[in-house]
């Protein structure tokens, strides 16, 4: 296990009491929570917000994290670092007129000093007009991702927008066996909470998307700034996918699994109702305990 602070390996210079990394997607920033002993040493380094820190274990890396908060606790320090620097969370008022998604990604990345990437989503999507009101770069991109049926992931100084449908079609990189009496495995299926229909309604257009896999009759109307039917239809499908994929979840505990990270495709086997195709939604790695916990969401292909 290695702890790197501002490019220097300080593993031997501190006493690590606990270290938990939360690897997330969908608007949640990856985070690293540390408790370090020997507080006097930490003071001597004069830590500042946005100092860079990362941890590695057995091939897994948190990627570069940015120091967010330091809280002294009886001779120890509780330290929180996130994958977003302060600039990515700074709110602003801006407008974006006749710009493509890749242009907006580039502008936001430059504003907060990060790199950017699109995966499984068309960077040529053009927006006639977008308004950003008291919204951070990360919040704006997360809002766009939700409308486009994508998630925003921040890792190692990079903003990445990942198309959910494309990722669901990818080959599984992990097979997880879950049995009926497996300790720590929790399968939650709230199928009745899936929307049957989501409508995008604006003064200019109204278009609905439907989920053929929903068992209830719930519907919802949202009002994003669509001005044409093509955009409204795409957003209705994207919003419905992002909403309904959260209805069925599976949580699994394991020994430390360096290969587990958010948005990877996994197949679940074991002869239970959880069998099938899933996407990793959030992973928690406990470096000191040597354990990992993954929360997965079921892949759905019934939106139209």
Feature roles, as predicted:
Residues 76, 83-84, 118-192:
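Short beta-strand-centered interaction patches in the first periplasmic/extracellular domains
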Residues 1-88, 249:
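Assembly/oligomerization scaffold segments
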